[in-house]
A protein has these predicted regions:
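Hydrophobic alpha-helical transmembrane segments of multi-pass membrane proteins
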Residues: 10-28, 38-61, 77-83, 108-120, ...
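Alpha-helical transmembrane segments
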Residues: 67-69, 129-147
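Membrane-interface helix-boundary motifs at transmembrane edges
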Residues: 27-42, 67, 90-102, 126-129, ...
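Hydrophobic transmembrane alpha-helical segments in integral membrane proteins
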Residues: 1-19, 137-141
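Membrane-embedded alpha-helical segments of multi-pass membrane proteins
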Residues: 17, 73-84, 135, 139, ...
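Membrane-water interface of transmembrane alpha-helices
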Residues: 18-25, 143-159
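Interfacial "cap-and-anchor" motif at the non-cytosolic start of specific transmembrane alpha-helices
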Residues: 169, 175-223
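The cytoplasmic-loop to transmembrane-helix boundary for the fourth helix
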Residues: 90-120, 131-140, 164-184
């Protein structure tokens, strides 16, 4: 399990580096946009949540005790961090201020995930919650799909608006941002299946870390 520990340590450092890039990047912005800065700190919070998650995995040796235990902890930590990332995208791309409905959907789905964990814990007396883990997994996928649909719709609307109102030289920048978001979403959709198997996780996790780092760099370039 040494390789799992090294992977968790690498993930922890990666999230801290991402958070540092986002936090220090704010100091170099001369003219600040309110929505962009809101999204920056949403991403910053998401990176800190993930960093805290990997630190907990390391100190508690959860995944070393079993892939199922690690998966349960992942399913509790990933939804809020992914939701913050999706909300940061939505916050920038939305042409109208309709975030409350989006946030309400996210909070509702995550609340159900937590309730499922609580029921499984009460029924089994430990974090080995059996079939309830798969219920949590299904709900996480629903949350990811919900966020993808909402954010992608706003990206499409904004793209059409830019095509109509701005010069064409803005479009490569928009396509670059869309590509990074797509990579991140694909990683988020495949991750629930990977976390159940340690051997696959060791191979696939570096791809996820690179996708998140690429997304953070893209976000910083937008500023």
């Amino acid at each position: 399990m040494k390789i799992i520990f090294l992977l968790q340590f690498t993930s922890l450092l990666s999230m801290l580096i991402n958070a540092m890039l986002l936090g220090l990047g704010s100091l170099h912005v001369r003219w600040k946009n309110r929505r962009y800065e809101q999204s920056r700190w949403m991403l910053f919070a998401a990176m800190l949540i993930l960093a805290a998650h990997f630190l907990a995995q390391m100190t508690l040796s959860v995944r070393a005790s079993g892939a199922d235990l690690g998966a349960v902890l992942n399913l509790l930590a990933y939804p809020p961090s992914f939701a913050l990332i999706a909300l940061s995208i939505y916050n920038i791309e939305a042409v109208h201020d309709n975030r409350r409905r989006f946030v309400a959907g996210i909070v509702g789905l995550y609340a159900i995930i937590v309730v499922c964990y609580a029921i499984g814990y009460c029924c089994n007396g430990s974090m080995r919650i059996g079939m309830w883990m798969y219920v949590m997994l299904a709900l996480y996928i629903c949350l990811v799909v919900y966020c993808i649909c909402k954010a992608s719709r706003q990206i499409l609307v904004r793209r059409k608006l830019l095509e109509t109102l701005t010069a064409s030289d803005m479009l490569p920048h928009v396509r670059f941002a869309k590509t990074s978001v797509t990579v991140l979403f694909v990683a988020s959709m495949t991750m629930p299946f990977v976390i159940l198997f340690n051997k696959i996780l060791v191979i696939y996790a570096p791809v996820i870390l690179l996708a998140i780092f690429f997304f953070v760099l893209t976000f910083c370039n937008l500023g």
